Amino acid sequence: MKLFKIVTYVPIKDARVVRIAMGDAGAGVLGNYHHASFSSKGVGRFTPSKGAHPAFGGIGSEEQVMEERIEVICEKEKVKDVM
């Protein structure tokens, strides 16, 4: 069985919902466990360019958002569902 690691960054307020959705789609299965993941918190920085539709801030303005990095493992067959 080939496993892949999927990593994503989400605003902290959305992290629980994203972790559950990834687990429900088949990520995080380790033996007799499911919905397994690892998270770490940090600051995400970005500047939206023209044509962007930022959830935070505005075009051309640097933003900083507290984010959670979520890591899960996933069987190859489930990657598309998890993504």
What kind of feature is each model-predicted range?
Residues M1-M83:
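Hydrophobic structural segments
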